Amino acid sequence: MPGKLTGSSPTTTAKMKCGAVIVAAGRGERLKNTTPKAFIPLRSKPLCQYSLDAFLSYPKITDIVLVIPEEKLSSFSDPKFKVVAGGASRQESVFKGLSALECDTAWVFVHDAARPLLTADLLDRLWESAKNGKNCIAAWPISDTVKLAQNTTIAKTLDRQNLWGAQTPQVFLTSVLKDAYAKAKKDNFTGTDEASLVERLGASVELVVGDPWNLKITTPQDLKLAELILENKL
């Protein structure tokens, strides 16, 4: 049975434990590269290494699970984090990572390794919201005019004033996210992010202002842009 969606937030030291699931099992066909996306080099480091470094250096995170393609399992051997094989879909991969967290992990940060420019400032903003028992995601207000299309014809212009682009990390009470995955499996539902699963439980999810540079690497152009951003930061 699903647990309660609301209630007192964890207060003891044991219950303040935070974990992170870094999803790095995607193939990245749109990058036109035979290497799994998270292992494509960005300034000489694998893409997933940037997210790993961000979470390893963030003191509130005590349990990290990296989810990667099965054939890459031998690429990492480090006692500071766990490595598990991904599933057939992103949703299955996140669930495998979630299942590998220590059982007393109260909160979980779920992050796409395809977003390598994660900062400690963004992690701080998310934790400030999450530590009071809230579920929250990083997001950025949409500035473009958004068209709802039917095939290639405009069906409607949406009011962008209330539209946000979801990012990661997304942070949840671990018990709530597990309940959300149980319901999704029961209903045979596939969502595009974790928040969409939690929303189906009736649980609230807060938007935390993300970072305009927290881009998702999807195309070769995105990879080049990330390189330029890193060059200017260094």
PLM regions with names:
Residues 1-9:
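Short, positively charged low-complexity motifs
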Residues 2, 164-234:
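Conserved alpha/beta core of the MobA/IspD/sugar-nucleotide pyrophosphorylase nucleotidyltransferase superfamily
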Residues 15-71:
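N-terminal glycine-rich phosphate-binding loop and ensuing alpha1 helix
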Residues 22, 48, 97, 111-112, ...:
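Residue-level signal for inorganic ion chemistry
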Residues 73-80, 148:
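Short loop/helix-cap segments at secondary-structure boundaries that form the rim of catalytic
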Residues 78-90:
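Conserved donor nucleotide-binding strand/loop of the catalytic core
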Residues 90-153, 167:
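Conserved beta-loop-beta/alpha segment of the NTase-like Rossmann-fold superfamily
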Residues 156-166:
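A recurrent flexible, glycine/aromatic-enriched loop bordering the glycosyltransferase active site
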